[in-house]
């Protein structure tokens, strides 16, 4: 009897949700009919016998149903694509036939139609075959953002050649590593990156093709002019398109390198489709969107999630060579953008720009990406009149991806608390000393309760379009990301390396990277949370926080590095504000004032080098300060004071 009630209730609710849909403009959840909601709630109560579960159903079921419907759409789309052996080029060519003259890309005033992209990519594909590159060969693509960049990797994909999308900011050793780890057979570089390519020629002796020279000869000795060669190439579709499978490698995309050398993540055709489809359906995008995408196209956010809306879903994208905070809203208004992307610290950079009319004169109704700090969320939506921020959590290679479809401030997504195993991703407890999972007497992992911090992991299911982990080009790196015996003996999971917290309604909140949480005064300190506070108190300046070892003291003391090239920081007011919002153990013991800071290509601040340098004024030229607990203020960290701290005489 109760099973019948469940079926009737859920079916009724799904019918109501499907009928009423979702308001795309505001990303509001549908209002379920009272009867349908009552049936669902009663069904759950019968099966569980708890008032608490009824309350959870009341609070979360509308969200879960909308998310569930969309999730099913994503799954069906992916399974159908696998069944049809659909590849990214095939889906793109379908859009070409449908709308050949529709604008696909806008770049610095230029427009590229779908037909133009198709012809250029056909030339690339045929050229690669003519040059002897075979299915499965890798070619390093080292270029700045421009339409040709997308067309080149798309053309390679048409014939099964795998482009490795290299970060255009890399030089010397990291660049050499990125090219070699993917086993590249050749390099395609931009005209303006010839010097960087020339600097590594002794270590990387590969054929080089230069894009962007026009009719001029490349300045790089021995390199070939790709533009001229493509002009002579066949513009018709290469016959090898049909020999490429949905399970073949499409591209390599590299991790950001915030904690070491970039890792080359394997992206297969259906994996690319998963990323694009997930965002497309979860935030209810249409086919006539104009997407502002100022992100680097070598990264998953810009090159997969953003560009995939063009290649797979027939939308238009506005791209630019490099991100500009001052031009973000100006160009969004100019090109009539309806959707915009962000990543990392971009939203804070936008808040730091002077107010101007374009801040609210745009047509953008939803922004999606990851990296908005909870401390600036409401300020951002208010200033820029933004109906919804669709923050998502995930990584290029991750299988535990979630999304905030309601615009709930601070949240990076949700999982259902009523149907917990519908999406097999969990928070597991981690040993703070070793970083390894804590296990119960059965040898399986201990799951976190609401409010407890843990590492987010996703259960791996081989050959599943959404849950298979394809790993990296480096097999050792792949093995390090896999945990075993999570829920039961023999299962495996992808380790995100990120610490999240889930509230009782299933909303997830990013807390920290594993290893970024440090312990001081017997308390755990989240560097990410303190960074958000320090940055806001300092006037939204770039800031990183990390733990440093202090001789004679247990744990690590907090140290904040703040970018303040104009020497604008008022230490007195900064200290007072910091003490008002942070507990004493979380307040940084040391300050370092920087002229600038290294940033990854995806606008994440690097701090590993800063952490290694510590707080020795004899080794650091930047201004250093120490918080004097007796004076209750920051004082200049002199060599004499450093010696006292080093000898355990500073009263810590």
Positions of predicted regions on the chain:
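Structural core segment of the AMP-binding/adenylate-forming
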Residues: 1-67, 130-131, 154, 158-231, ...
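Conserved AMP-binding/adenylate-forming core of the ANL superfamily
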Residues: 14, 80-89, 93, 101-154, ...
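Conserved pre-ATP/AMP-binding loop-to-beta segment of ANL
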Residues: 100-101, 145, 213-215, 221, ...
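Conserved AMP-binding A3 loop
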Residues: 113-115, 250-274
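AMP-binding/adenylate-forming catalytic core of the ANL superfamily
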Residues: 170, 177, 187-189, 340, ...
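Conserved AMP-binding/adenylation subdomain of ANL enzymes
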Residues: 273-290, 298-338, 349, 353
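Gly/Ser/Thr-rich phosphate-binding loop
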Residues: 312, 329, 333-343, 351-434, ...
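AMP-binding/adenylate-forming catalytic domain of the ANL superfamily
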Residues: 582-604, 622-647
């Amino acid at each position: 009897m109760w099973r019948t009630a469940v079926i009737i209730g859920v079916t009724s609710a799904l019918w109501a949700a499907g009928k009423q849909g979702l308001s795309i403009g505001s990303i509001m959840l549908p209002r379920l009919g009272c009867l349908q909601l009552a049936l669902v709630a009663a069904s759950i109560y019968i099966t569980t016998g708890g008032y608490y579960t009824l309350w959870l159903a009341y609070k979360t079921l509308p969200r879960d149903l909308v998310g569930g419907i969309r999730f099913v759409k994503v799954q069906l789309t992916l399974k159908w694509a696998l069944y049809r052996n659909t590849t990214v080029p095939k889906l793109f060519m379908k859009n070409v036939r449908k709308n050949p003259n529709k604008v696909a890309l806008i770049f610095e005033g230029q427009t590229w139609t779908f037909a133009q992209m198709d012809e250029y990519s056909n030339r690339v594909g045929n050229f690669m075959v003519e040059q002897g590159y075979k299915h499965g060969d890798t070619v390093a693509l080292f270029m700045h953002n421009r339409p040709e960049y997308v067309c080149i990797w798309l053309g390679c994909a048409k014939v099964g050649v795998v482009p490795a999308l290299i970060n255009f900011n890399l030089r010397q050793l990291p660049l050499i590593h990125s090219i070699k780890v993917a086993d590249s057979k050749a390099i395609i570089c931009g005209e303006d990156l010839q010097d960087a390519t020339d600097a590594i020629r002794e270590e990387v002796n590969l054929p080089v093709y230069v894009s962007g020279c026009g009719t001029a000869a490349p300045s790089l000795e021995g390199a070939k002019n790709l533009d001229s060669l493509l002009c002579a190439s066949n513009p018709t579709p290469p016959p090898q398109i049909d020999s490429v499978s949905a399970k073949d490698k499409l591209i390599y995309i590299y991790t950001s390198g915030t904690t070491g050398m970039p890792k080359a993540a394997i992206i297969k055709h259906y994996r690319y489709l998963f990323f694009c489809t997930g965002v497309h359906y979860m935030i209810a995008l249409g086919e006539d969107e104009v997407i502002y995408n100022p992100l680097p196209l070598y990264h998953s956010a810009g090159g997969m999630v953003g560009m995939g809306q063009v290649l797979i879903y027939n939308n238009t994208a506005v791209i630019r060579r490099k991100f500009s905070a001052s031009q973000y809203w100006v160009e969004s208004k100019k090109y009539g953008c309806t959707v915009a992307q962000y990543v990392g610290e971009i939203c804070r950079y936008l808040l730091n720009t002077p107010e101007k009319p374009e801040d609210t004169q745009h047509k953008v109704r939803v922004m999606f990406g990851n990296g908005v700090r909870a401390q600036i969320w409401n300020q951002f939506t208010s200033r820029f009149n933004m109906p919804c921020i669709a923050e998502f959590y995930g990584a290029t290679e991750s299988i535990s991806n979630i999304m905030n479809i309601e615009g709930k401030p601070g949240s990076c997504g949700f999982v259902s608390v009523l149907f917990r195993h519908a999406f097999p991703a969990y928070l597991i407890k981690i040993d703070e000393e070793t970083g390894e999972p804590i296990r119960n007497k059965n040898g399986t992992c201990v799951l976190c309760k609401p409010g407890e911090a843990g590492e987010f992991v996703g259960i791996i299911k081989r050959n599943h379009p959404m849950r298979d982990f394809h790993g990296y080009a480096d097999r050792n790196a792949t093995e390090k990301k896999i945990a075993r015996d999570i829920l039961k003996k023999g299962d495996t999971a992808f380790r995100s390396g990120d610490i999240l917290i889930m509230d009782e309604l299933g909303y997830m909140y990013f807390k920290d990277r594993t290893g970024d949480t440090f312990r001081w005064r017997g308390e755990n300190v989240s560097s990410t949370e303190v960074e958000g506070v320090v940055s806001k108190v300092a006037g939204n300046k770039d800031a990183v926080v990390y733990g440093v070892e202090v001789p004679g003291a247990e744990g690590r003391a907090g140290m904040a590095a703040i970018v303040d090239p104009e020497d604008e920081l008022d230490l007195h007011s900064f200290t007072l504000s910091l003490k008002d919002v942070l507990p004493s153990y979380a307040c940084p013991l040391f300050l370092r004032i920087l002229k600038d800071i290294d940033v990854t290509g995806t606008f994440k601040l690097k701090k590993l080098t800063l952490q290694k340098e510590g707080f020795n004024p004899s080794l650091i030229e930047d201004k250093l300060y120490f918080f004097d607990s007796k004076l209750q203020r920051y004082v200049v960290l002199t060599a004499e004071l450093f010696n006292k701290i080093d000898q355990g005489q500073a009263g810590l």
